[in-house]
């Protein structure tokens, strides 16, 4: 079995004006697709690895043969992270969090605004390429960031929200102003999906 590029769960222009259609085409059809292609190439001589979900694959990097471990880390992480990213966004979404995730955010951070501030710090403070995350770690919400295409799954944490802060995710529209992109992201967060992930992670 090989890994495949998932279709976007919405049209390429569905997240306009916050994420532009050209970026979505490049990000999904080119960048994400390249991670899938390179992951399949990496595991070609280890077909048993392709039987695992990509999330399971990257959750135990020590089980990956050493000669392909870096390639699987980078490309398996890229595939898992982007698949997750498309799913936690939606058109006509955003706004305030709801349900159990709202309660947990308020309890952990004090308010949604305080959580957004901490998330922004993680996202802007990530030097170079990487991701900012809201994760469940030992049953508690935490904000973290990872370099490159590393996933919280590699550290035993479960992501419930994530933002790609590689320049390819925002440069066409936001140029070098990463904070504007981070602010725009909150308009497309799919809180229903975040709640679903949060319920499964607890």
Curated annotation (Swiss-Prot):
Keywords on record: Iron, Metal-binding, Oxidoreductase
Cofactor(s) of this protein: Fe cation
GO cellular component terms attached to this protein's record: cytoplasm
GO molecular function, one term: metal ion binding
Protein EC: 1.15.1.1
Catalyzed chemical reaction(s): 2 superoxide + 2 H(+) = H2O2 + O2
Top EC class, one word: oxidoreductase
Protein's UniProt keywords contain Zinc-finger: no
Pfam families linked: Sod_Fe_C, Sod_Fe_N
Binding site for Fe cation: 27, 82, 164, 168
Cofactor note (record): Binds 1 Fe cation per subunit.
Position of the signal peptide: none
Function: Destroys superoxide anion radicals which are normally produced within the cells and which are toxic to biological systems.
Assembly with partners or alone: Homodimer.
Similarity comment: Belongs to the iron/manganese superoxide dismutase family.
Name under which the protein is recorded: Superoxide dismutase [Fe]
Species annotation: Enterococcus faecalis (strain ATCC 700802 / V583)
Species lineage: Bacteria, Bacillati, Bacillota, Bacilli, Lactobacillales
Gene name, Swiss-Prot/TrEMBL: sodA
């Amino acid at each position: 079995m090989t890994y495949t590029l998932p279709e976007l769960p919405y049209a390429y222009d569905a997240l306009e004006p916050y994420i532009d259609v050209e970026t979505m085409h490049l990000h999904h059809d080119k960048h994400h697709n390249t991670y899938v292609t390179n992951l399949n190439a990496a595991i070609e001589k280890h077909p048993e690895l392709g039987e695992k979900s990509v999330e399971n694959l990257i959750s135990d990097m020590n089980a990956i043969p050493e000669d392909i471990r870096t390639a699987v880390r980078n490309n398996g992480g890229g595939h898992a992270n982007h698949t997750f990213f498309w799913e936690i966004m939606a058109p006509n979404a955003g706004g305030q969090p709801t349900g159990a995730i709202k309660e947990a955010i308020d309890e952990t951070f004090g308010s949604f605004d305080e959580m957004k501030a901490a998330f922004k710090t993680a996202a802007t403070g990530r030097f170079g390429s990487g991701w900012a995350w809201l994760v469940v770690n030992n049953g508690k919400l935490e904000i973290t960031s990872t370099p490159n295409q590393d996933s919280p799954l590699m550290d035993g944490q479960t992501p419930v929200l994530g933002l790609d802060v590689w320049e390819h995710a925002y440069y066409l529209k936001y140029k070098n102003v990463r904070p504007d992109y981070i602010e725009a992201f909150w308009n497309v967060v799919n809180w229903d999906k975040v709640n679903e992930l949060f319920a499964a992670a607890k």
